[in-house]
Amino acid sequence: MAKTIKVIRKKDPKKKNLSDPLAKQKLVWKIGHVLTLVFGLLFSITYFYHVLIFFKYRSWKWLFLRVNKNYSFIQSKRWYMKLLSWSPQVMYRLSLIGVFMSESVTMQQNWVGLNPTWNDLLSSENFHTLLIACLWFFGGGKSFYKILPYMILSYLHLTKMNYELNANKEEKIPLTPKDRKMLHLLAYSELLVILALTLDTILFKTGTSGFMLVIYVGIYWLRLNFSPYAQVAVLELLVKFEKYVPKKYRDKWQVIKNFIYMKMKEHEKRTEEVARYA
């Protein structure tokens, strides 16, 4: 009797990803960060070009503080030119949609199998990021400074993409000196948003600037309580400007510094507890 030959079929490497239950989520995560970075950069180009031609839509009689709302960058009345004039707004929205996509996947993975409380969500940096993105998406007014933190964050995630998608939750992502500088820039860019919103409120740039400033400061207060890089950035600023503070206010200044120190210690303690019971 002839022996039967058992045919062993090799798995197609292209079909390997189909067996990954998280393949779709990883794809959404990658697309989200790409949208944020690409459309954020494209919007930034249009934004700074608009800044360079400020003299065309701002009156010198009002020290360039008053904006001519009837001015249009594209003067043609053709329908396709009208659509083109909306391109900065579309790019701005698409960059924020990318934030919704990537952060939603990250939060879903962080809380899978769990039932997070409101306290858990309010202490989550990813939830803060989503809240701020919703504020910019629905609050009106587009600005480079508002999406700059998201572009930096997406750049960091995409450069570490292969490691993040394949590493276990317990593994820490190695940070290079360049990554630390980018995180430092990210923290300061979030503080820059407060300054930009304050100027918009003082100059009455939009009718909602004041409300957005109050809401953003409220969310940033949460970040200051739970985000280590935000705490480090604020503490560095407090130390830098301490020498300019009058002596009679030094005690109050020290109280603020002690508060930041306390929050940093609490974060270290929480991290140690999580590592211990993980």
Swiss-Prot record:
It comes from the Eukaryota. It is found in: Cell membrane. One of its GO terms (biological process) is endoplasmic reticulum tubular network organization. Keywords: Cell membrane, Membrane, Transmembrane, Transmembrane helix. Residues 56-129, 202-205 are extracellular. GO terms for cellular component: cell periphery; endoplasmic reticulum; plasma membrane. The keyword Lyase does not apply. It is a multi-pass membrane protein. Its main location: membrane. The chain crosses the membrane at residues 35-55, 130-150, 181-201, 206-222. Residues 1-34, 151-180, 223-278 are cytoplasmic. Coiled coil: none annotated. PANTHER family: ABR032WP, TRANSMEMBRANE PROTEIN 33. This is Uncharacterized membrane protein YGR026W. It comes from Saccharomyces cerevisiae (strain ATCC 204508 / S288c).
